[in-house]
Design a protein with these regions (language model features):
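N-terminal strand-loop-strand
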Residues: 1-19
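Unchanged
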Residues: 9, 23-127, 131-137, 146-154
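NAD(P)-dependent dehydrogenases' Rossmann-like dinucleotide-binding region
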Residues: 141
Length: 154
């Protein structure tokens, strides 16, 4: 699974782990067009390297964003070219790890007197320099991965 870490200076979700993607523009034909355009802008993924499988159900984040996850395979030959303004790092996590419910964690915190629950999928991987690194995949990204898991095992 191809994931990114957002740069720390972004207004929305700075420093968090996310999928390549972003806001729809008026000229985008649909969610797939948005996903492909944003993936190209953020990580240099050209559409010729993507075999789109389809969309997962829409997901609404705790902060009110409405996300339509688009799922596809990336063909061999793609070279990452990340936009340094938006993307601090691009990395991969094996799908087998992400789809193993033993790796899914539930958390609960209280913020301003309101109990909030969220999922995480901690991953111990290797960064672009080959150094060991811990990644904390959580919130909407972890929840959408959990939805993918539920979809695949149904």
């Amino acid at each position: 699974m191809l994931l990114t870490q957002r740069t720390d200076h972004l207004t929305d979700h700075p420093g968090q782990i996310s999928f390549p993607g972003g806001r729809a523009e008026d000229f985008d034909a649909d969610a797939i067009a948005t996903a492909l355009r944003e993936a190209h802008e953020e990580i240099g993924l050209e559409t010729r390297f993507v075999d789109v499988l389809g969309e997962l159900p829409t997901y609404t984040t705790g902060t009110g964003f409405i996300v339509t996850p688009v799922v596809g395979f990336v063909d061999p030959g793609f070279t990452v070219n990340a936009d340094p303004f938006e993307v601090a790092e691009v990395f991969e996590v094996p799908l087998s790890f992400l789809m193993n419910p033993a790796n899914h964690r539930r958390h609960a915190v209280e913020l301003n007197g309101v109990r909030r629950e969220f999922l995480s999928i901690p991953w111990e991987g290797v960064d672009a320099q080959g150094e060991p690194r811990r990644y904390f995949i959580w919130g909407a990204t972890a929840a959408m991965l959990r939805n993918l898991y539920r979809f695949l095992v149904a």
